[in-house]
Amino acid sequence: MAGAKEIRSKIASVQNTQKITKAMEMVAASKMRKSQERMAASRPYADTMRKVIGHLANGNLEYKHPYLEERDVKRVGYLVVSTDRGLCGGLNINLFKKLLAEMKAWSDKGVQCDLAMIGSKGVSFFNAVGGNVVAQVTGMGDNPSLSELIGPVKVMLQAYDEGRLDKLYVVSNKFINTMSQVPTITQLLPLPASEDADLKRKSWDYLYEPDPKALLDTLLRRYVESQVYQGVVENLASEQAARMVAMKAATDNGGSLIKELQLVYNKARQASITQELTEIVGGASAV
């Protein structure tokens, strides 16, 4: 059994770690609230944009934009949103597993995949497994802006415009609540028809100003950007929630470990005292 001094050292070490994880839990809780506010503020715009685009997909358009037309699939692209930091449980790996399963399904059909990464954890993971990373952005911090995302989005849209991609998806964690974050893969292009039953029963027509091509070119790009940005802010809220839960679990586990070590320490101290008493009694008997 380890000596009492060594056990006391271990207890002190765990207590110090527990203080760190408790502080990180509190910081994550504060950041999560701010991330939720940012996510809630951007959701109405993203949802409304999705509805407008859903109208377009079900509409009788006088100009058929390339983003609305299905193609034979030879190569697909993914805009993958991950975190820049760790200590957030299985948030990233669950997302990566889901994406790898879908990429394997495409590969089995002879379809290749390109990846545009948002977040350093995704970059390091997919570089390690041999993914074809064509664009990346990292270090956006806790308050990302749309301008920081333009690079990867532009690369993927250009590839789609040039016919080098036939489908485009955004991959991120959807924030449900503090205890639940769901990895999601959402098709961006070609524009999926709305699943709203009311929209399917209606026939939509539009008047365009100045002209359909100019308007749709801008609107559809804004749609892609808005969905990617929403994925980023949802993923950020998911990250802080997962980190808060992970740090709380670490703090609680630290408390349990301290109790176990305290019990071992008490036993070691008791054994030491018993041994000393035995030696004293033995010495007295010898005299």
Swiss-Prot record:
GO annotation, cellular component aspect: plasma membrane; proton-transporting ATP synthase complex
Keyword Cell membrane: yes
GO molecular function, one term: proton-transporting ATP synthase activity, rotational mechanism
Major location (coarse): membrane
Any one of the GO BP annotations: proton motive force-driven plasma membrane ATP synthesis
Annotated PROSITE patterns: ATPASE_GAMMA (PS00153)
Cellular localization per UniProt: Cell inner membrane
Record InterPro entries: ATP_synth_F1_ATPase_gsu, ATP_synth_F1_gsu, ATP_synth_F1_gsu_CS
Biological function: Produces ATP from ADP in the presence of a proton gradient across the membrane. The gamma chain is believed to be important in regulating ATPase activity and the flow of protons through the CF(0) complex.
Name the record gives this protein: ATP synthase gamma chain
Source organism of the structure: Klebsiella pneumoniae (strain 342)
Gene encoding the protein: atpG
